[in-house]
């Protein structure tokens, strides 16, 4: 129960003889990001006032970053079970069974605020942290992905943030030897003061023994392994749980400093140590450092841990207990090991160039007891720190916020009438041809090629990358056995992975936008032939203390839940990042677009049958699977110019309600797509995303070098709607004439078996003329040279940065 105080009452409380302390409580609470009600609850639980070290421990462990005090009730509604799920939310990472004795471990996490302050180190340590979550479970890291958001690139500050973040990601990933195989990047003014850096990692394990974090074995030794502990990253968890301001932007000590070469040794040493059977439990030291690792290991194991800070390897002299406990120095682990194994493990870790010390033991009493300079400096119930943490009570508004009610009034009828060759641009009241509309959309950084970014990443290290960044709708890596003694898996299996979120859609309808993010991720996996298995999510939102902010978060969680249930993709865990707001000097607060990033993984049984997005040969037929281009498109709310890239970037309007998400239709389209890929009926596949039909066709042309002849059916629909409307459940495929016969035959056969919600539509043919030609009723609508499309698309971000 939340207790509220008048200032007078709180002063009386803290000055009472029972709770009197030597430090200034008010300033200490402000420093730790705690409320007066939190302090009263701490005193109630302890039946005494906390000392300054203990208050710091509560500050980080009761922060949103560590305990999800604002979001936990919403997360409980996610579907978390399934036939392949071995480990769900609550551990360092999720684990799914992919057959043949192999398990896939994966998770996504944010490093947003540190990257705003120090983009290189913030992004680099974000990569290091997510890798530790993976190998702490006993899995070898095999791939990295990322989802990034920045402000517009006409601002030098945003360019600097982009360059720093990309450099940090590439530095850490390249040095540690894990390929960065995919991701997504978006740009919007809402991220100008608060960029988003979400890192996802995948790992492979071939043992039945999953290393968990719950400590056990009374009296068993606690082992510290890895890097030394310094003063970097002090209070990082609390820092990540508050809005960014001019003061916090200057708070560089809250950003950690990473060493990827040491992490590489830590990976190998930990995996070797796990094979000995000596390790009972393992926990990496991420947010809240030693405090969090000790608290979580003790709480999950329903035991206690005694930690002697005098034995912790220190990087700097004169460190206080407070600094040891809250430091977030990187590349550190805490183990509980079997008695008698200490020396053997010590030799192992030293051989890999790591610090290793026995720093404590497991206790029967369920407390975290900390010793420094021979004295007990903290003694707290483990559950109070890591399990029985506060939950904020928010009143969920029961009506759509006013800003959305206004946006949802917008209709396509408010746009100028379309002409055969173009449209009047609302933004400046000038005519723009369809050719130039397409070129303009391809030059937008959110749509344009991200080759400037991914060419800085080593995506071929480990030699398992099957699909390189930008080649297909999802990244694909080969599953290569890590152990000679494992059950012999098929050599040609693969894992597909993707990260997705259309933040503009989520801003304009949090529930529909979030459903769409899940559906698009599943559609992208299906477009390479992968069966979606499960998701991890990163919920990036603004302050939940504002009614609209909490409503957005709640509606988003509802949308994710609905989509995951419909598409059979359980949630294995993830991360919540709140208070992504920028406070300007005039006290104006700018919230980011709500951005629930969906990381999804899928299984491919034969990587020789995957599809990329490029046309394969001239004269192939181009088909669209899903919603048809027919007269009734005007009445179909599943396809719309509302909330579209066309509306925002051509007309300067970010408005309207995003299209309806038909999850049953999505499921049918995905299953059909996977099957025709498996049967070898189609040569390429690409979903229709930002920019709609014409941008998707242009993308296929650019990546292949071939052109396309597209003939739009006669329609009463607006031309811009046919060309650039957006919506789900639509995929382009190409196939030969003979394959087209098989495509129609297979569609007819399944149509006879039951109710089919989608159609297949012949749109045209691949050509060798190096041109994209779009016509309707013998009128040429678009006629663009592929080289012009390619130059615009490939160089857009580079030109913005070097202008």
Curated annotation (Swiss-Prot):
Gene3D superfamilies reported for this sequence: PurM-like C-terminal domain, PurM-like, N-terminal domain
Residue sites binding Mg(2+) 2 per the record: 133, 284
Primary subcellular site in the record, as a coarse category: cytoplasm
Pfam families per the UniProt record, alphabetical: AIRS, AIRS_C, FGAR-AT_linker
Protein residues bound to ATP: 68, 107, 537, 574
Tagged with keyword Nucleotide-binding: yes
EC code: 6.3.5.3
Pathway: Purine metabolism; IMP biosynthesis via de novo pathway; 5-amino-1-(5-phospho-D-ribosyl)imidazole from N(2)-formyl-N(1)-(5-phospho-D-ribosyl)glycinamide: step 1/2
Any single GO BP term: 'de novo' IMP biosynthetic process
InterPro entries attached to this UniProt entry: PRibForGlyAmidine_synth_PurL, PurL_linker, PurM-like_C_dom, PurM-like_C_sf, PurM-like_N, PurM-like_N_sf
Keyword GTP-binding in record: no
Disulfide bridge partners, by residue number: none
Molecular function terms from GO: ATP binding; magnesium ion binding; phosphoribosylformylglycinamidine synthase activity
Subcellular location: Cytoplasm
GO cellular component assignments: cytoplasm
Designated name of the protein: Phosphoribosylformylglycinamidine synthase subunit PurL
Gene: purL
